[in-house]
Amino acid sequence: MMADESFDLESLGSDEIFEGVNLDELEQQAQTQVQAQSSQVVVPSEKQKQNLNLPNSYTNSSQKVRESTVNSQASLSSNDLRTELLIKSGENAILRANLLKQSEANNAALESLNNSIKQKQDEYQRKLEELKKEIEYAKTKSLFHEREAQDAIETMKKMKRDVKNSPIMKKSHEEDGDNKLLSSSDQLAKSTKHAAKNSPSKKKRKTSVATAEDASTDSVSSSIAISDASLSLSLMKDLLSLQKREDLYFSSRTLAYVFGGCMHSLETIEGEEEGECLFNNLKALIYSPDLSMDSSNYVQSVVQTSSSILNYSMKKLLYNASFAITSLFNALLILDPKSSTFIFQENVVSLISGFLLKEYEKSNFLDSKFYVLIDFLYLYLSIARESADDFANITKAVDPSLFESCIRVQNAPSLIKCGVCLIISSTTPSFCASVNLLNADDKSQESLMQLFTTMAHILVVTTRERINFPELNEWITLHRFVISFFTVFIQMSGNIGKEILKVCNPLIVCIGLAITWYHQQLLSSMYPQNECVEILVSLVRLLYILSSEDLSSKFMLAENALQPRFVYAIACCAFGDTEQKAFGNLGEEMYFLTTELLEVCVSPEELEQLYTNF
């Protein structure tokens, strides 16, 4: 019975065990009972005195002894109860604490179990949703295949009906009927003239009739085969014609959309008869194309007319018309990359390149309207560099000095960004900015070094000038583009590119100065930490690739005490707790790169001292 009623205390919470019981009230009742027992003293009544019939003196002494005994017993009993009560109170307190801890542990376990159950439910719900999506996809795919099968069946039925209704099939059916009549007459002749069955003349006639039937059957079969082949060929021709017409319509509609946006700018060339004629020709080509042309010939015609308008507008210095027609060329390159061949044949690339360079030299600043011209060259070179055979000739159409002009520090950051993208699009394993890396003369090498120096100065603009915050964000974004260019250049050109960049001392110095500046920004928390870390790591990687044994001397020859500042920044990146925490998963890589750079810049004793200081 006791075994059945036993329970596990650890499985219950404190609230369940003392449900309905007030322990404080029980403890107070026990204390009250002890105090009442200690205050009670046993005194004999008068009736008891009379029954004893003892002398008064004996009675008084006996009473005193009895009272003292009772008092001592009561006092002893009270002390025991107090002690026992204190023990019970302590046990109750310990039990309460243990039960409270057990309850908290049980609640935590229950909460953890609930969280685990919720996670499992979410996971199963997600899997269920994925399965539902897969089922819906399978159903849709099945319906699609079923529809295709039905269409194929209907097409086959239609083709069969067309073949049956063709004149050749009708003729074959008539010939089959004549053959049946001929065979019936032969059977009738057999039944009536059985005697003449084995005559030679009859056998000869039967043989000739059978030969005619076989020839007729073969001719019908070959006619049906020829009819099917001609029908398939006709269908294929119709489909190809429809496809060409659809391509032509698509090109025309796309160009019409672009042309409609720049028509107002192109109307400026209508002042003279030649310009008006060119404008009307282009307008007719786009809005009313000749349906007999295929898409390739149509695009070529549009390119020829557009190049004539571009040449005319640049001669007349009609800038808006030049920008509008260049937008049309951009649309053509996106619509049909093969149009780059037609564009090159019309000398559009050299025309735009020369126009840009002339305007830059004249005004010493490229207006924002010239973005569209740079975008065109960027798109064109990006497409043209896919064909390595023609790229050597294409680079001759773009002057190398144009690339450096587009990234001058005096320009707006957005314009410099377009220029950097233009340089990236001109980079191949053998070429960069219209310079042949494998066979460059002194003038080409000088222009290339000037280009890299100008691009390196972009990295240190923020360290030398006070720039407001919005514009500073544009420069930081521009730094990413510059770092991307040098990374792409090294990846494509390999060891040749590394050796070219290593001898460009301004580039090495600017990278070191940029590292110190970004390290300061990382500690100042003025910019998002992840952006500073990203650019700082990229700069350290780039410097590690381009570093040489004379790296320290290059920094010493620089201005603004770059050598000690650089060593401090690199040492902080290697050994500083704040920097390593900011680098996160890149901490090990940064430690390796920075310690390698420190070994080049300082002596072993100085490196040991730096490590000790940190």
Curated annotation (Swiss-Prot):
Pfam families documented for this protein: LCD1
Location of the region described as Disordered in the Swiss-Prot/TrEMBL record: 29-76, 157-214
Alphabetical UniProt keywords: Cell cycle, DNA damage, Nucleus
Bias-annotated ranges (Low complexity): 29-43
Annotated GO CC locations: ATR-ATRIP complex; chromosome, telomeric repeat region; nucleus
Biased composition (Polar residues): 50-76, 181-190
Cellular location(s): Nucleus
Domain of life where this protein originates: Eukaryota
GO biological process: mitotic intra-S DNA damage checkpoint signaling; telomere maintenance
UniProt feature, compositional bias: Basic residues: 191-207
Database matches in InterPro entries: DNA_damage_chkpnt_Lcd1 (IPR018622)
Subunit structure: Interacts with cds1.
Biological role: Involved in cell cycle arrest when DNA synthesis is inhibited by hydroxyurea, and in mitosis arrest after treatment with DNA-damaging agents. This protein is S phase-specific.
Name of the molecule in the record: DNA repair protein rad26
Organism whose genome encodes this protein: Schizosaccharomyces pombe (strain 972 / ATCC 24843) (Fission yeast)
Name of the gene this protein is made from: rad26
